């Protein structure tokens, strides 16, 4: 039964843009087709005999053509799609009758389409697409061979976008419909289709860029295409052909590349290092797109992520707090880490305990992953179970269950566990599937807790998910019973059972309510019979030093530690001034903070300290003289703990804590002894926050506060005026300028070391640089913007030395003429700017003048000092330094003078105690603004350090005070003894009338003078080296180095000193410097070759190999780190890999060997012997080079250039240069030095900072290309350059700059240089052998990032290339998209019926390149077409009329006179009109539109196919076709037609000549009407023009 016309299945469904008339017309034509096929009486009677229905479509063809001629392009496409749907709808009915009917539908629709194409109503492209889609690829009916021959003939006449769409239709839409088994007859039948595909994909056909062909093939080829043997073979060879370009676009050995967390070039806060799949594409993870490549390059780089993740502290690099976190392959990676650790534990002797270094790291990673929603427990436990199932381990099963117990017991409120219960039970069954020997010891809490972790997990799951838990086995039951017995017989002295119960029972349970007071009691327990312990300066605290053993702390889960931390806060809040919190409380908090991430512990402690600071300052304002001493005590001991006990954290520089500390300094601080001490402590807090962070942390801290995102608030306005600190005005500077200046030095050193680009526009950086004076020698490593800011600084506020000397001497004389009371009134409350800050200078004047005699200070001086605020004390110290400099310049500056000055200063500091030693040294180091003043102050500081008083304190501290990380109890007791031996008094204590019954000293647990000196000594050594020619007095070096036994970041310090002074400090001095500090630093393990033999005993290659082996060992260990790294990662300065990297760099920078010889040795290492993991050595070598100063990378660049100079590329094959087979050649013992240089250079640029890519593109690549002489040289350069173009472009800020600077920036500049070099090589006659690969490479660049930015350069340079290569590149120089102002009609379409005429036309063009004359036979069609075209109002056809010029009037007169001869000499007229195309016409065309363009996405960076220009054109016209001819006299903007969607539909399918003729007639009609209205007599003869 057939469906009636107009039934529901035939009703067209169009979008809102289609008019009702259009829908009606489409339904009508469909009904006519259906009527023609379904109700044909001939078929009814003669179907068994024939399928020929005769030529009954003639009328329908004419109707169809007329209808199509009136449609816009979009409507034509919609109509063709509807016809295709109708054919497929009928053909899909599988009855024999319907198959026959479907075949007739296909024939009718095909005839309609071909007739419309023949008459010019539809484009060749649309016709071919429709014919393809009407074919029945289910093979229920036969494939029309003649139709597919027609399609094959049409292909060369279609632009490449249309050909791409045709290929898409065949592959994605039609071949997928083929059955999976074909008979030989069917294979023979579709061979014509195979021929069409082969014709399209054949590289020699050059129908479209081969890269687009490959893209379509790889994206859309169905499995059915593999049944066609010739096609399969062709596609395989096509993919193989692109292998060189695919390899070239990746770094050699990319699958084995990994960074080291905390590396100077490893900047985690940018998207550049985020692993693929963690929110942003990583620049190291370069997208392969459509290029074929190895399997390891088509998936996430798990090895890179694995190597980052398994390093302690590495996880923090992957997910900065500011980034949104998404999960990725963490489940698999952590499961592998666990299984590796279990396997390693199996190899240990049975009696040897399992090292917990890496297990603690794994637990930390798991907790972090789940809290940040990077791990899904269900997936994680399932993956882990499946891995453990394959290999039975027995040693570390308790450690695995401890991880499970941590998740179940601590993180149930942060993640879903209900769907992971089954996986947990199955994981337990896999771990303990047989007879198990259980071992647990109550005298070892950590092992005991892990022994019962499985039972604890079961108890919690049974309570929370009773309906999902299976019955426990006998082992679990016995353990649960054992735990319940511990509950029934609770014994608080059994710490092991206490830890287990604390882990299992929450605080809201009955047992939990017993555990909390027990832990609180242990915190408050007393060690000896004495209940109180005397801290420094007779402050009393609870006498308890170790509340919980270390093993007990390791037996607690994350939740239990958090509970214990909250309990520790209780005594920190509730205490009295005579009974302060015990040291045990602080040590417990310290252990928890060290074992957990910042967000889990330290953050809470910082918030508590910040609140106490606000309370203390509020108490000052509210209570006046009756200040809240308890609030100040709490504030002081909390910051004392944060500053001195936790000096270095890897999440240290927090914006909020720094801002809160700065806010404290902007307030008015009352003058009392307690506030003086808090002020000094807060200065240390800021100093360490700013200066003791890692390099990237330091940069982040400063850019957050002063960078582009700085907040224009009151505090920032304070910070913008550093010179107002001593002279208050509208915005008084908040903090000691010397501290802030020291922070800027640290910031700029970090910028130098990391080579980061700092955005300066709309930041405060130039302002704060401008506010200080900078000795020139100390600015050697400053970036250009900082030097420019210094040059622009205002020097009008320079110190007036004469005025200072006069004021001090006058004040000294006034002392003798005033009574003590008058002196105190005169100078203690004086606000005269000339004399209010000079008192320390006056005291120094007296002390210096009596340096050889005994001088005692009188009480009135202390009374004056007592009346000074903390800020005034700072200003007085700077004033003292100004006076010392001014006074020293009046004398003979010799060694004796400096010793006397230092002796007088020591008298003020250590005997009179009117000034602190650290404040004096800070002013001496940071206050001078010129090199002359800085050198004087450094020499004074040198002598001050060598004074007996200073030396005595250093030696005592070094000999008697242990490291607080390892011996906290002994440290606190030693600090008390130190203050007993060397007390520091407040000014009020030294006044005669002081009441000794009140103790003004704040409770000090950890701080002292030596601790305060540590960050200052860092800057002292930098300045001393800079001002003294990078030489240090050995005695000073020995004295200062003793302090670094207690330094929190000694390796960072040594590295930064050697980096900024590289090339300035001699080899012996550098070695002495390093060894002096290394002997004091516990974790500084240098090689024996350096310490004993100064790198002179072994060869340089052996030295490099030893350093690389150490780095590899510190990165590849599984359970226990090597002996030359820190033993505990939780309190280490650096992770193991970063520690060995920094120490290796320190050795190399202090080595007597030059950078050139060391870099040559790094290259030679790869030639020495076969390496088991060659790319690992290359990667570590690149990591070394990126962490070393620029001299080493310059040496590598020189080696690269030397390859060209020495002609080494001539010995390399093309395959050796391009392909990533370097590892294979090394494993076959076939090393090549030139290839090694290239591979190391690739990985160097991969690891380097993004900011160096500017140097790479504008300086390095041009330098290399200057030496390129041969094709192999060019390929050798491209092997280095190509992998980094995408890395450069994917940085968003860089991409924005590229869009603004276009071809003069970044990767476009590099590609432009390559084009120019290739053009110059072609002019010099250099033979290009692998031209196809070069063309493919250029297309790859065009479509992936270059676009049309380089089109003009390409036109110029490609014109110099051989003809064959130009032809392959013709698509590159075609215009991708016409601009809005320069849109033009579509290019001339071709049809099979006009093939001969077009061949003649092409022949004429070849011999007359400046003419484009249509054939005579086409003129009648054109004339007929024009006569049928309806006239539309001018506003629908033309753009808004422009102002007419005299030339236009002349043209109109000329045209009207010429038009009279149109009927008799139309051919000549058209020829005249098309003689001279303009330049704009040559550069802008519009492609044929196809129905696929509204059905699918366009190819990235797609361009349109235009035939190359005829031979003989100038180079700038290379590759451009002349598809539109215009009158030579008409201005271009007057001739451009309206956009396609506003044009007359008839014009869309005309040739350019027809369009132009039609447009001329419309213009004449419009002008004719105007002339009629104006009644111009000389136009009367043209009133009856035919249209």
Swiss-Prot record:
Bias (Basic residues) occurs at 1577-1587
What residue spans carry the region label Acidic?
1387-1404
- Give the compositionally biased regions (Polar residues): 1410-1426, 1463-1484
Q: Does this entry carry the keyword Transcription regulation?
A: yes
**Any Pfam family matching the protein:** Med23
Question: What's an example GO BP annotation here?
Answer: regulation of transcription by RNA polymerase II
Per the record, the major location class is nucleus
Domain of life per record: Eukaryota
**What cellular component GO annotations does this protein have?**
mediator complex; transcription regulator complex
Q: Where in the cell is it found?
A: Nucleus
Q: Which UniProt keywords apply?
A: Activator, Developmental protein, Nucleus, Transcription, Transcription regulation
Please indicate if the UniProt record lists Transcription as a keyword: yes
Report disulfide bridges, numbered on this chain.
Answer: none
Ranges of Low complexity compositional bias? 1430-1450, 1567-1576
**Function (record text):** Component of the Mediator complex, a coactivator involved in regulated gene transcription of nearly all RNA polymerase II-dependent genes. Mediator functions as a bridge to convey information from gene-specific regulatory proteins to the basal RNA polymerase II transcription machinery. Mediator is recruited to promoters by direct interactions with regulatory proteins and serves as a scaffold for the assembly of a functional pre-initiation complex with RNA polymerase II and the general transcription factors.
Subunit structure comment from the entry: Component of the Mediator complex. Interacts with let-19/mdt-13.
The UniProt entry, under PANTHER family, shows:
MEDIATOR OF RNA POLYMERASE II TRANSCRIPTION SUBUNIT 23
State the similarity comment.
Belongs to the Mediator complex subunit 23 family.
What is the protein name for this chain?
Answer: Mediator of RNA polymerase II transcription subunit 23
- What species was this sequence derived from? Caenorhabditis elegans
Gene designation: sur-2
